């Protein structure tokens, strides 16, 4: 009888540890996923601004050259 209680208690402790472990890993995964999504969105917007600026810069230069030709 006592061994069954010990076995039950060890199973409960293992299940508690396992559930805490799984929840911790799941939470860390979600946090890293959020950080990754936010960082990629930030760098994507930064990249779009740079390409837009370069496009405007080249557009101004081409207009300048066209104005000098005529």
Swiss-Prot record:
Keyword Membrane part of the UniProt annotation: yes
Segments traversing the membrane: 12-32
Subcellular location: Membrane
Topological relation to the membrane, as annotated: Single-pass membrane protein
Keyword annotations of the record: Membrane, Transmembrane, Transmembrane helix
Transmembrane in keyword set: yes
Cellular component GO terms held in the UniProt record: membrane
Principal cellular location given in the protein's record: membrane
Record-given protein name: Uncharacterized protein YKL183C-A
Lineage of origin: Eukaryota, Fungi, Dikarya, Ascomycota, Saccharomycotina
